[in-house]
Swiss-Prot record:
Lineage per the UniProt record: Bacteria, Pseudomonadati, Pseudomonadota, Alphaproteobacteria, Hyphomicrobiales
Protein name, per record: Lipopolysaccharide core biosynthesis glycosyltransferase LpsD
GO BP annotations, alphabetical order: lipopolysaccharide core region biosynthetic process
EC category name: transferase
Organism: Rhizobium meliloti (strain 1021)
Pfam families xref list: Glyco_transf_4, Glycos_transf_1
Gene3D superfamilies, alphabetized: Glycogen Phosphorylase B
Pathway(s) per entry: Bacterial outer membrane biogenesis; LPS core biosynthesis
The EC number(s) this enzyme carries: 2.4.-.-
SUPFAM superfamilies, alphabetized: UDP-Glycosyltransferase/glycogen phosphorylase (SSF53756)
Family: Belongs to the glycosyltransferase group 1 family. Glycosyltransferase 4 subfamily.
Length: 343
């Protein structure tokens, strides 16, 4: 099986899953090539699993024609069985290459279907997303395939390196600093829980506002901004709890990161976490935007070691039974086989 990936993403959970899947498919014997944007911090993590090409697709630019020419040359030389586009921009660039099975993986809810003209099958990461795509009028095939995380044991970072006391309760938040991720609410919630520190692993356009909020609340001594980390598990290993506070979260890799690191998770009732997680079984769930409820959940975890242990075990079991690397990789390989057989 030969697969050509097109991915014009930047930095974040979607990119982590892209790297995870490429490497998982490589280990299953799939030959792969990938077209990505230049300068990606995660390029080195792809190099063992795929031959990499770099380029930028812009709608109004002469460079798009050069990139299209390069892609056509790669397709002639590589002759892929499958072309897989990742998200909107890559789907717009999907070639009408009749010799390959053409799929697009949706990481979020599309506003319309105009970008998927050359796509035969849409892969949705939740049943709700698949239903919304049908409502928009998609008549071709849909598959629902979730994500997995490649949790790799990592030694904990030294708390002293982040000026954090050894006996503090440490909450870890992770992702791109955009409004919908709810980091401002997480900062406000942590303010209400004494002897609790917050490590924010990531970066993004909201960073300046988040740092300003931290200063306004007098929390500079308890909040740490670590920047992007290619392997965040060292920070998760050193923390005590993981929090997802998104107002909108289809099913990012972030939904599995705490479980993968063996940490108890608190999550907002956004779309993805609501499908994946069960309140009191493998996570504590709070309403979106409920800073008071989030603070209460953090305090509850801080004060109840038995609850932390129970939620960690429940999360590990959910990850193993529903969202394992093997199960998700098997689903993609089965989709590839069925699609290629129809050509």
């Amino acid at each position: 099986m030969k697969v050509m990936h097109i991915h014009f993403g930047t930095e974040g959970g979607a990119e982590r899953f892209f790297v995870n899947l490429v490497n998982a498919l490589h280990e299953r014997g799939v030959e792969q090539r990938a077209l990505i944007r230049p300068g990606r911090s995660w390029r080195k993590d792809l190099e063992n699993g795929a031959t990499i090409y770099e380029g930028v697709f812009r709608r109004i630019s002469l460079s798009r024609f050069l990139l299209k020419w390069r892609m056509n040359r790669v397709l002639r030389e590589f002759e892929p069985d499958v072309i897989m586009a990742w998200q909107l921009r890559a789907s717009r660039f999907m070639p009408a290459h009749a010799k390959a099975f053409r799929i697009s993986r949706l990481g979020d809810y599309p506003e319309h279907l105009g970008y998927y003209t050359n796509v035969q099958t849409l892969v949705c990461i939740t049943p709700d997303m698949a239903a919304k795509v049908r409502e928009l009028g998609w008549k071709r095939d849909i598959e629902v395939i979730a994500n997995f995380t490649r949790a790799r044991p990592a030694p904990p970072v030294a708390r002293a390196d982040l000026q954090t006391p050894a006996d503090a309760f440490v909450v870890v938040g992770m992702g791109r600093f955009v409004k919908r991720k709810g980091f401002a609410g997480l900062i406000r919630a942590v303010k209400e829980v004494e002897n609790t520190y917050l490590w924010l692993v990531g970066d993004g356009p909201e960073r300046e506002q988040l740092e300003q909020l931290t200063d306004e609340l007098g929390l500079r001594d308890r909040v740490r901004f670590t920047g992007w980390q290619t392997n965040a598990y060292g920070f998760l290993s050193a923390g005590d709890a993981f929090v997802i506070n998104s107002s909108h979260e289809p099913l990012g890799n972030v939904c599995f990161e705490g479980w993968g690191a063996g940490k108890p998770t608190i999550a907002s009732r956004a779309e993805g976490p609501s499908w994946v997680m069960t309140h009191e079984s493998d996570a504590l769930m709070v309403d979106c935007g409920d800073d008071v409820g989030l603070a209460a959940a953090i305090r509850r975890l801080r004060d109840d070691p038995a609850l932390r242990e129970r939620l960690s075990a429940g999360g590990s079991e959910t990850l193993r039974t529903r969202f394992s690397e093997k199960a998700i990789t098997d689903a993609y390989l089965d989709l590839f086989d069925r699609g290629v057989a129809k050509r």
